[in-house]
Amino acid sequence: MAAPLIRSRSNAVVRRFRALKERSGGDLALLEGTKLVEEALAAGATVTEVAASPRAGRMPRGRALLEALDKRHVPVSLMHEDVLASVSEAETSQGVVALARRPVFAEETMLARDPLLLVAVGIQNPGNLGALLRAAEAAGATGAYLAEGCADPFSWKALRGSMGSAFRLPHLRRVGARETLKRLDARGVVTVAATSSGEMQYDQVDLTRPVALVLGNEGAGLDPELLAAASARVAIPMRGGVESLNVAVAAGVLLFEAARQRRR
């Protein structure tokens, strides 16, 4: 028997989804769209509940996802398009939203072998943070530390930017930046800070060792104490009148330089 179509925004299921939309944090994340739900499932995330419009079930990809969820015994509620739009963060609902448990990662997993780490400080823009995590995973990073002032990696915009990397790339949130650098130094990890005033160019430092790349936001960058605490400070040379790069772009440059050196 088909599930009844939810038409009221006061329905208990709708209120449950809306509560997470309006209050980020906690143990659950709100996922939007077929692709992101697929990525979460593939990463082994626990999807606890799904809401979908009838339109999603008529599309081949949406139908396949709903069948996969049914096999996993994940509760699926059908919602009228207007009702589903009320729990969606997107301007245009993609027809599927889900609740999933946020993964919990262990630091030892990040440090287990040949660490290539990222330390992000004050990355407030969720889209930039998501893109940064995506670049880190693509370059083969073993983990990331998200220090003071960073956006929630499981907010809608961050998840859209990372496209599932937040579920796969081990990371720790709300860590102290200075304490993290000290702890990494004690573990034999070289910390390399990105700054326009770096004493060497990014491709002149040895990134084949256990290393953590430290980046701040585009506006403020890293504070002097953090820069002083790092093992090395590197700059990305730029031409023309360009003074800085988007932090995810800068991270990508450094991460893929590390990947290049490690392939030699």
Predicted feature descriptions by range:
Residues 52-57, 101, 121-122:
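Structural motif
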Residues 1-67, 150-151:
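Boundary-proximal intrinsically disordered activation/regulatory segments immediately upstream
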Residues 4, 42, 68, 77, ...:
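RNA substrate-binding interface of SAM-dependent RNA methyltransferases
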Residues 98, 135-139, 153-166, 224-264:
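Structured adenosyl-cofactor binding patch, chiefly the S-adenosyl-L-methionine
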Residues 33, 124-132, 243-250:
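Amphipathic alpha-helical repeat scaffolds
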Residues 64-89, 172:
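A glycine-rich helix N-cap at a beta->alpha junction
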Residues 192-242, 246:
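Active-site/ligand-binding-proximal alpha/beta "capping" segment
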